[in-house]
Design a protein with these regions (language model features):
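Functional-site microenvironments in short loops/helix caps that host divalent-cation chemistry
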Residues: 1-111, 120
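Short, structured beta-strand segments at or near domain termini in extracellular proteins/domains
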Residues: 119-133
């Protein structure tokens, strides 16, 4: 339960008969969808929730070169950098409660979407600066 909120046993149980499977079938973070802030252990820098829960919108325009060659081979759709209307996609990072493929769980993995697209697997990671740290 220390890694974060990803597509796991609890998620799979919430979708009976859907035919979902995945490489995280033995992992169980206890949340079927989004989890409250700080539900999982902080990293070595004391930062919570950098992986899983929801994809984090970033200001950066997406570029295919941001991903490693093995990622682009597995997900050729990530070669696309703009929408059909010419709008540049924006970067999404951190994976979500829906993801269970080890490639998409890498901190280096970049996903993308149309700016302003909304869904239950995309959002923001809020930061609180603690004085004296």
């Amino acid at each position: 339960k220390d890694a974060g909120n990803y597509g796991d046993k609890t998620f799979l149980k919430s979708l009976p008969g859907e035919g979902w499977s995945g490489s995280l079938a033995e992992y169980d973070d206890g949340a079927a969808r989004t989890a409250p802030v700080a539900s999982y252990a902080a990293n070595r820098l004391g930062i919570f929730d950098l992986g899983g829960n929801v994809w984090q919108w970033c200001e950066d325009e997406y570029k295919a070169s941001m991903n490693a060659p093995d990622v682009l081979k597995e997900y050729p759709v990530l070669e696309k950098e703009k929408a059909s209307d010419g709008t540049a996609f924006r970067v999404l990072r951190g994976a979500s409660w829906l993801n269970n493929d080890p490639l998409t769980l890498r901190s280096s993995f970049r996903n993308y979407d149309y700016p302003g697209f909304r869904s239950g697997i995309r959002g923001f990671r809020c930061v609180l600066v603690v004085s004296g740290r």
